[in-house]
Regions:
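Alpha-helical transmembrane segments in inner-membrane proteins
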Residues: 1-232
Length: 232
């Protein structure tokens, strides 16, 4: 947002977005270091609560900063900033950035699959996974870091497109089961398909106007989220 307000190009916007994700991750590590850097051990519900509440507070801080940037931005750039907040694939056509994103996707997927076995055990509970030899805290730190990197890259290219990371894994698990060796690559591909489908609908349903991608994914994601909450 700050890069857009300053009139920066696509590469600078991507770098600012990725840098913001890494800064938020670093802040999470600093504020919740006792929970994230604790020694491996049995499940600790208080540790989970600390990480969750710290993440909520960081999200609130980021929302406040975004509000300030929007209120101080020039009028001519407000539309671009709003579209970026709601998701815009305009930056994804930048070939150098797109190529780097594909390379990053391959590397991140390989890193995630490395922990697929541990994730399968964690589905049965952290205590059970720990008793079977999974270094739960180290796996947690590694996966949080990978998630932050992947989120930073995605936001750098497409803006703040929400609910894709929630909808795609649930649909994949519904059809193919919970084996993370299958879920991780399938969910990443399905997520990309959902975003492209939402972008295509947004560009065609009200042409020549363009509907924001994030709004369309939210219209799909919110009902699925509520449906999941109501399941026994």
């Amino acid at each position: 947002m700050l890069a857009i307000a300053l009139g920066a190009g696509a590469v600078a916007i991507a770098l600012f977005a990725a840098g913001g994700a890494f800064a938020a991750l670093l802040l999470l590590f600093l504020l919740a270091h006792r929970a994230l850097f604790a020694r491996d051990g049995p499940v600790d519900q208080g540790r989970d609560g600390t990480i969750l509440l710290t993440g909520v507070m960081i999200a609130s801080l980021c929302a406040a900063v975004l509000s300030l940037v929007l209120s101080l931005a020039p009028d001519g750039r407000l539309r671009t900033m709003i579209f970026w907040l709601l998701g815009d694939l305009g930056g994804a056509v930048n070939l150098p950035l797109g190529g780097l994103a594909v390379l990053a996707w391959v590397l991140l997927l390989a890193a995630g699959l490395r922990d697929a076995g541990a994730l399968n055990l964690l589905l049965g509970g952290e205590l059970q996974a720990y008793t079977q030899g999974v270094p739960t805290v180290r796996v947690r730190r590694r996966l949080i870091s990978l998630t932050a990197v992947a989120t930073g890259i995605a936001v750098a290219l497409a803006g703040a497109v929400g609910f894709v990371g929630f909808v795609a894994p649930h649909l994949v698990r519904y059809f193919v089961g919970a084996n993370q060796r299958v879920v991780l690559p399938a969910a990443s591909l399905l997520g990309a398909i959902l975003v492209l489908l939402a972008d295509t609908i947004g560009r065609s349903v009200a042409a020549p106007l363009q509907l924001p991608v994030g709004a369309l994914t939210a219209l799909v994601g919110v009902p699925i989220f509520l449906w999941q909450l109501q399941r026994p």
